[in-house]
């Protein structure tokens, strides 16, 4: 094959004509100090707050302090190889996470990277972890119930879609159990659940994921995990990452339940970062803006107005108290931000009353408007009666002579306390709750021994499903009791006679 010189020269000329020098501008800075997961970077004058920065080895950092002559940056990964004088590049991106249906059923870290060994998350849509919460114009009052399946909660401390309900108590009092039960109870419904584990042991998170998988709840749940061994910055952004994932569904007009387990560990991680960044400490050494940290997170949970899709995000933040002290800094902050709180008491827990809810200081400030009407009818005075019963029971311990009305109240209180006990991972449908509490508040249990209350409930609900299924169906469909109230009275009376005869209580 012969190549003529003029052909070669013409090809070279064409290549030269097509050549364009592409100049790429990269904003770079220099590490001037590094240690304890914090880097001080000089030279990135146009850097944004919460922007991702790239360190050598592909490790990412997040700009938190924007000062006159340098940037305080937290490193989101291993930092032993980073040293003074290293080059840092801007990415131009605020910290963002993948969002959408591809995340459902997955366990991811706060950056959206998978932890479950099921391959990459196939989502091409991202949302920044920090956004401003929807304003008043976008919102609608809470009016739809979110059933947790827990009798004590749905009857006395009802939660509505778009509400923020705090769960607080000492360690090992059943806080996570209430949240996980609420997630399991959404099975078969239209609610997507997000469980954000902050600063937990890996074994604890694995147990929760296993239980959600066994009950089929992972089919509609996302787990965001930042464990105790992860760097503090990941613990700090984990709740925000979960909120961003939930907002995507909320703005699509869907309903989300998000659990932050727990925010006291996020506050501790934020305190660690703030002190390392030399921010001035305040009460209990927390930075001055720790209230803002939690308020801007929890304000993102809301019920959207119908013109914006009518979606909702319900938040269940969890706070751990120390020796029952609800007046500490972080608990009081979050109590004032949320729409109510469920307080779990160690004494009740150890007495076998589980869930160990102290009805005296637990409250739902907006959930009453969302409560199923049938439940409101049967449980209207239940919370007040139980709170009074606790006071009377304490008084009766002194052996004082009690009048008949007080004795009747103590008898009723004993049986209602027993009736509200419930095992873990066995949420109850709302129609069963209504029928069960109906029997208690109408005095049908008053002449039964306390130890027979739960067997009575189990057999009664079985009897209703077998012999009178239309009553439960009517309550579930209409949410009202008026059409079946007389029939329900008759059914309880008929069953009670059978129960007494079978158990030799005549």
UniProtKB/Swiss-Prot annotation:
CDD domains found in the cross-reference section: ATP-synt_F1_alpha_C, ATP-synt_F1_alpha_N, F1-ATPase_alpha_CD
This protein's record includes keyword Ion transport: yes
Predominant location category: membrane
Membrane topology term: Peripheral membrane protein
Record-listed E.C. numbers: 7.1.2.2
Disulfide pairings: none
Localization per Swiss-Prot or TrEMBL: Cell membrane
Cellular component terms (Gene Ontology): plasma membrane; proton-transporting ATP synthase complex
Top-level class of the enzyme under EC nomenclature: translocase
Residues at the site labelled Required for activity: 362
Keywords, alphabetical: ATP synthesis, ATP-binding, Cell membrane, CF(1), Hydrogen ion transport, Ion transport, Membrane, Nucleotide-binding, Translocase, Transport
GO molecular function, one term: ADP binding
Catalytic activity as recorded in UniProt: ATP + H2O + 4 H(+)(in) = ADP + phosphate + 5 H(+)(out)
Binding-site residues for ATP, renumbered to this chain: 169-176
InterPro entries documented for this protein: ATP_synth_asu-like_sf, ATP_synth_asu_C, ATP_synth_asu_C_sf, ATP_synth_F1_a_nt-bd_dom, ATP_synth_F1_asu, ATPase_a/bsu_AS, ATPase_F1/V1/A1_a/bsu_N, ATPase_F1/V1/A1_a/bsu_N_sf
HAMAP family per the UniProt record, alphabetical: ATP_synth_alpha_bact (MF_01346)
UniProt xrefs under NCBIfam families: atpA, PRK13343.1
Assembly mode: F-type ATPases have 2 components, CF(1) - the catalytic core - and CF(0) - the membrane proton channel. CF(1) has five subunits: alpha(3), beta(3), gamma(1), delta(1), epsilon(1). CF(0) has three main subunits: a(1), b(2) and c(9-12). The alpha and beta chains form an alternating ring which encloses part of the gamma chain. CF(1) is attached to CF(0) by a central stalk formed by the gamma and epsilon chains, while a peripheral stalk is formed by the delta and b chains.
Described purpose of this protein according to its UniProt entry: Produces ATP from ADP in the presence of a proton gradient across the membrane. The alpha chain is a regulatory subunit.
Family indicated by similarity: Belongs to the ATPase alpha/beta chains family.
Name of the featured protein: ATP synthase subunit alpha
Classification of source organism: Bacteria, Bacillati, Bacillota, Clostridia, Eubacteriales
């Amino acid at each position: 094959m012969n190549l003529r010189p003029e052909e070669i020269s013409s090809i070279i000329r064409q290549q030269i004509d097509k050549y364009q020098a592409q100049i790429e501008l990269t904003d770079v800075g220099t590490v001037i100090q590094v240690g304890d997961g914090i880097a001080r970077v000089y030279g990135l004058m146009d850097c944004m707050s919460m922007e991702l920065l790239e360190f050598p080895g592909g490790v990412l950092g997040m700009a938190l302090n924007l000062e006159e002559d340098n940037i305080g940056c937290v490193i989101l990964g291993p930092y032993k190889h980073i040293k003074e004088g290293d080059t840092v590049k801007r990415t131009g991106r605020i910290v963002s996470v993948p969002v959408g249906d591809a995340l459902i059923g997955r366990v991811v870290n706060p950056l959206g990277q998978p932890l479950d060994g099921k391959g990459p998350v196939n989502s091409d849509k991202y949302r920044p972890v920090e956004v401003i919460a929807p304003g008043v114009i976008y919102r609608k009052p809470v009016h739809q119930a979110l059933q947790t399946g827990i009798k004590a909660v749905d009857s006395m401390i009802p939660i509505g879609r778009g509400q923020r309900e705090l769960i607080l108590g000492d360690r090992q009092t059943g806080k996570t159990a209430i949240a996980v039960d609420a997630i399991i109870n959404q099975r078969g419904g239209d609610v997507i659940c997000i469980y954000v584990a902050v600063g937990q042991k890996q074994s604890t998170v694995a147990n929760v994921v296993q239980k959600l998988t066994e009950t089929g709840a992972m089919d509609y749940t996302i787990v965001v995990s930042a464990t105790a061994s992860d760097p503090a910055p990941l613990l700090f952004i984990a709740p925000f990452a979960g909120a961003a994932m939930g907002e995507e569904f909320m703005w699509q007009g869907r309903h989300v339940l998000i659990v932050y387990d727990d925010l006291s560990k996020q506050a501790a991680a934020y305190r660690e970062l703030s002190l390392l960044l030399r921010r001035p400490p305040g009460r209990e050494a927390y930075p001055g803006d720790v209230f803002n940290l939690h308020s801007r997170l929890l304000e993102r949970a809301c019920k959207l107005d119908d013109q914006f899709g009518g979606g909702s995000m319900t938040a269940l933040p969890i706070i751990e108290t120390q020796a029952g002290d609800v007046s500490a800094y972080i608990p009081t902050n979050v109590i004032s931000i949320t729409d109510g709180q469920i307080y779990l008491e160690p004494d009740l827990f150890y007495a076998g009353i589980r869930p160990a809810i102290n009805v005296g200081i637990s409250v739902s400030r907006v959930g009453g408007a969302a409560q199923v009407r049938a439940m409101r009818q049967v449980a209207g005075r239940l919370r007040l009666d139980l709170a009074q019963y606790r006071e009377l029971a304490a008084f009766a311990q002194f052996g004082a002579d009690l009048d008949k009305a007080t004795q009747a109240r103590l008898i009723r209180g004993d049986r209602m306390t027993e009736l509200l006990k419930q095992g873990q991972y066995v949420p109850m449908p709302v129609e069963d709750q209504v029928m069960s509490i109906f029997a208690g508040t109408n005095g049908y249990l008053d002449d039964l021994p306390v130890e027979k209350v739960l067997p009575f409930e189990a057999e009664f609900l079985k009897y209703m499903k077998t012999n009178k299924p239309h009553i439960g169906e009517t309550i579930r469909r209409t949410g009202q009791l008026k059409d079946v109230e007389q029939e329900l009275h008759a059914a309880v009376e008929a069953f009670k006679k059978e129960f007494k005869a079978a158990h030799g209580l005549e």
